């Protein structure tokens, strides 16, 4: 299945010797709420869909790199299901391990930084020989915030938002922007900074208040209810878990709310997790194909 969604794009790339790529791209959030779930799917049994697991490239396990070339990134993608009928949720778990955090690189649509720059997911992924691609953040719709890509500071206008920081040493953290600056984060070793939210998990526990209304700048509705989602969790240095959740498709997947999303990260042992751009733009691209089922949108043009 292959669909091209023409969106504003930001790519976060995981590049190795064989151009294995984990790519995050920027797209607008299309806020359409699904209504109340039929039941609490967090109590339902999770089933793994046969034939959808894709094992990582390279040798299994972390392994040391001393005396040999750095190991290739380890990537696995597994499709899972929760609930049934109108309460069914379909989502994908992407487990990523790298030997060098600076292999996580950012790529911009048409290789240009700015607002209202658009391209297709497939084109950007193809230009960068991407093996894997998911949503990123919301930077192109803002004139404020901290934007760091590949160790380059593009914007340093801190706000009250909590941003996600991926450091050169392979660690991940969140920080409220108005307590720091882009230059301070850069000096501390920040490699890439994403700004969306909210924080889902901290210190290995789901953050309190995730049921409360959460609004993104420029949107007049809460995005806390069941929606298509993209989020990243931290398992340890250079080890991350990405969740891609389909939604707005009754009988296939209604999406997840923030509490449900946080619960999955906690169950996998993530000490920190952060919500990225979601909604109508949620897409999982792998090896030239869109492997999830992006929800129908009125138009793919911006």
Predicted regions and their residues:
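Short, glycine-/Ser/Thr-/acidic-enriched flexible segments
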Residues: 99-101, 139, 171, 179, ...
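Alpha/propeptide regions of enzymes that mature by internal proteolysis
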Residues: 131-135, 274, 282
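Short, solvent-exposed aromatic-acidic interface loops
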Residues: 109-113, 178-182, 245-249
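Conserved, well-ordered active-site substructure
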Residues: 143-160, 165-166, 216-271, 281-302
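Zymogen propeptides
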Residues: 2-163, 171-174
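Active-site-adjacent helix-turn-beta-strand microarchitecture at beta-sheet edges
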Residues: 139-223
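A short, polar/proline- and glycine-enriched secondary-structure boundary/capping micro-motif
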Residues: 114-117, 183-189, 219-221, 251-257
